[in-house]
Swiss-Prot record:
Keywords: Cytoplasm, Methyltransferase, S-adenosyl-L-methionine, Transferase, tRNA processing
GO cellular component, one term: cytosol
Catalytic activity: guanosine(37) in tRNA + S-adenosyl-L-methionine = N(1)-methylguanosine(37) in tRNA + S-adenosyl-L-homocysteine + H(+)
GO molecular function terms noted in the UniProt entry: tRNA (guanine(37)-N1)-methyltransferase activity
EC number: 2.1.1.228
Chief localisation class: cytoplasm
Protein's name according to its UniProt entry: tRNA (guanine-N(1)-)-methyltransferase
Organism of origin: Psychrobacter arcticus (strain DSM 17307 / VKM B-2377 / 273-4)
GO annotation, biological process: tRNA N1-guanine methylation
InterPro entries: Alpha/beta_knot_MTases, tRNA_m1G_MeTrfase_C_sf, tRNA_m1G_MeTrfase_TrmD, tRNA_m1G_MTases_N, tRNA_MeTrfase_TRMD/TRM10
Subcellular location: Cytoplasm
Protein role: Specifically methylates guanosine-37 in various tRNAs.
CDD domains (UniProt xref): TrmD-like
Length: 254
């Protein structure tokens, strides 16, 4: 999968290109991450990419011209990589607190793309005309504001890359994460058997796979009900999960 990131701080992306699972994916050429600096598309000696806003007000606004040229270059690079450069296969995504909140279901959908062109804003924002002309979607991490779009862009890439086939050591690891099945994840334990006076739940040591699966599902349900009642209210169980819920309810009545 191909990622082009448009940012005035390309050095920040060494974190995701060189470390951890994402770094390994880049090293093994399963993923390509290229950084494009809009300052390279300016024509003045100061390489300015921002100006004061029309109508007055605080702060600066990123200008449309250098960003548009950076996006066009990113599209060219994406096509050379083999991407179908259109909204359906390689969208231009603007990281913005005004965008649609990123979710696990949307991440899974994004794994079907050939690539992404991710636009990282700074200052007060980006000239609206650039957004109207070039941006296919805006994505937010939540109802808060950061100093720029670089960190959200890395979060987006990390979440998508780890869901691609053959990226994780075991693809089932991602399938068992929180939100994947509509519920929070269950607790996990490893050695030692006892820590700070707390022992590993005996059911996990029993070797009885059906009982372990039932225990884990119960923990998911209880955690979701307690910690994220909004998720629980929206939870739509599968046929198999509905059977588990009935079994848990029956066990609780005994």
């Amino acid at each position: 999968m191909y990622f082009a990131v448009i940012s005035i701080f390309p050095e920040m992306f060494a974190t995701i290109r060189e470390f951890g699972i994402t770094g390994r994916a880049v090293a093994q050429k399963q993923v390509t991450i290229e950084c494009i600096n809009p300052r390279d598309y300016t024509s003045d000696n100061y390489r300015r990419i921002d100006e004061r806003p029309y109508g007055g007000g605080p702060g600066m606004v990123m200008m449309a011209e250098p960003l548009s040229q950076a996006i066009e270059d990113a599209r060219l690079r994406a096509s050379q990589y083999g991407c179908r450069v259109d909204k359906a296969h390689c969208p231009v995504i603007y990281m913005s607190p005004q965008g649609q909140t990123l979710s696990e279901s949307s991440v899974v959908d994004m794994t079907e793309y050939d690539g992404m062109i991710i636009l990282c804003g700074r200052y007060e924002g980006i000239d609206e005309r650039l957004l109207s002309q070039y941006v296919d979607m805006e994505i937010s991490l939540g109802d808060y504001v950061l100093t720029g779009g670089e960190l959200p862009a890395m979060v987006l890439m990390d979440s998508v890359i780890r869901r691609l086939p053959n990226i994780m050591g075991d693809d089932k690891s991602a399938e068992q994460d929180s939100f994947v099945d509509g519920l929070l994840d269950c607790p996990h334990y490893t050695k030692p058997h006892e820590f700070a006076g707390m022992a590993v739940p005996e059911v996990l040591l029993s070797g009885h796979h059906a009982n372990i699966a039932q225990w884990r599902f119960r923990q998911q349900v209880e955690r979701t009900q307690t910690r994220r009642p909004d998720l629980w209210q929206a939870f739509m169980p599968t046929v198999e999960q509905a059977k588990w819920l009935k079994a848990l309810a029956k066990a609780d009545k005994k």
